[in-house]
Amino acid sequence: MSVPVPPDDPRAEEAPGEVETAAAMPRDAEHWAKLVSTLDVTNAPEGAVNINVTGKSLVSPIQGFGKMWQKTYKVPLRGSEATPVDVIKEWKANFPSFWPPRNFFYGGLTGIAPGDVALLNLSMPGRLKLSTGVFVLFADDESFTFMNPQGHMFAGWITFCSYVKSDVTVAQAQVLIRANDPIYEVGMMLGGHRKEDKFWHQTLTNLSTHFGVKEEVETQIVCVDKKRQWNKAKNVWHNAAIRSGIYMMGTPFRLMAKPFRADKQL
């Protein structure tokens, strides 16, 4: 499948945060999210840290800072009778359970559907938690695509899909991304790429295990654009890691203030 505004399309630069609707693609219009300018999270699940998402615009790879990468992770479900539709159905229904420990995905009650906004609370070095989110750009029976908001580690999207190759069902995750700002780019150079690869390797391993399969995850990495976009260095203002760190440092003060807020409500 393709995304509505590819990275080489000038429209992606002209309208940051706005996603082309399915009007140009009537055959599968119901599978595409409607046009949005900013994200909104109205009912955050209990336990989810809801910062760095509401009011943020969506960003394609064109709006990112770092080098542009396309990474493809796939695992053959050899020996399984699961069809691509079966794989995607299970992946959507159990998406958070396939992630590595200490990483949390708070999606909608109805699963993964076009236009949904999910909160992410991700583990970071030093026992910090990065709070960010994703937008469900596309979802059908055999694939679904997430797009990232301002402040996320990456500007871009990730597509999860399943297909049949040589009579074997394959599960795949493919990202097209840039680090969103210079701080994230340095982090990727200092081990972030390895951590990202390990994350999706573990996810696909967990998925294949769910189907009773033990196969090696295959990886293909291509640097699509080696240039860094210095005019996007200002993206650091939205850096969700920095904002999450500040939020965590303020936790003791919020706890101390909680009784006083409760008194005012009486």
Which residues make up each language-model segment?
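Hydrophobic-ligand binding "helix-grip"
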Residues: 125-166
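Short, surface-exposed beta-strand/loop "edge" segments at domain boundaries and coil↔beta transitions
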Residues: 82-83, 127-131, 181-184
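Short, highly charged C-terminal tails/helix-capping segments
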Residues: 208-247, 257-260
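Short hydrophobic/aromatic-rich beta-strand segments that constitute the beta-sheet cores
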Residues: 120, 144-147, 171-173
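A conserved amphipathic terminal alpha-helix motif
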Residues: 179-180, 186-224
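Short, intrinsically disordered, mixed-charge
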Residues: 89, 93-97, 151, 167, ...
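Beta-strand/loop substructures that line and gate deep hydrophobic ligand-binding cavities in soluble
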Residues: 150-195
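Hydrophobic ligand-binding cavity/cleft-lining segments
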Residues: 2-125, 240, 244-266
